[in-house]
Amino acid sequence: MRVVDNLRHINERINEACNRSGRSSDEVTVIAVTKYVSPERAQEAVDAGITCLGENRDAELLRKQELMKGNPEWHFIGSLQSRKAKSVVNSVSYIHSLDRLSLAKEIEKRAEGTVRCFVQVNTSLEPSKHGMKKEEVIPFIQELSGFEHILVAGLMTMAPLTDDQDQIRSCFRSLRELRDQVQKLNQPNAPCTELSMGMSNDFEIAIEEGATYIRIGSSLVGNETGGVQQ
């Protein structure tokens, strides 16, 4: 299907989820996850009205940036190795995977300006997922108070791939509650107003629990494997 048609359907579902939770759809931004599709397909998303694109490989991110038009906002959404930070930090608007002090130090070292980051939290406690434990987040953010180039824009999580909606909702709700705790710190470089959570299979629940960024791949742009894999 055309991306514009997929986006229309997704926007309808976003509106319905917002209506159920008393929110405005203006509070929710769609990140098109384009890591598995060609630059041409990603361009189709931008032409359809998508303003944010998400990549998880530095090489593919830079390749698409060179080839695409329309000046979309780029989000790095994958686990970021410290040695790859140099090629990413000054090329994206947001990094969604800050999860350790060594990476924060590398970002601080390489940044030419403010880098907006989401602290990744493993709310499901699955060993296969990256992210900090919930109890580690506030001490970590407090430790970032002296980092001049890092702005903690919000928190990010991924729910387990399950049909148990209560389990999914619990992960998203716990992230929102943790975000509220971070905001009470009143830390200048950690406004933490955003929540990056929800993907193709669970974004409606995420919206109901307060998501401000949702990461949509397969149901929006498909999964054509036209991206460069490493």
From Swiss-Prot:
It holds the Pfam family Ala_racemase_N. The modification N6-(pyridoxal phosphate)lysine is found at residue 35. It comes from the Bacteria. InterPro entries: Ala_racemase_N, PLP-binding_barrel, PyrdxlP_homeostasis. Keywords: Pyridoxal phosphate. GO terms for cellular component: cytoplasm. Disulfide bonds: none annotated. GO terms for molecular function: pyridoxal phosphate binding. Belongs to the pyridoxal phosphate-binding protein YggS/PROSC family. NCBIfam families: YggS family pyridoxal phosphate-dependent enzyme (TIGR00044). Pyridoxal 5'-phosphate (PLP)-binding protein, which is involved in PLP homeostasis. This is Pyridoxal phosphate homeostasis protein. The gene is ylmE.
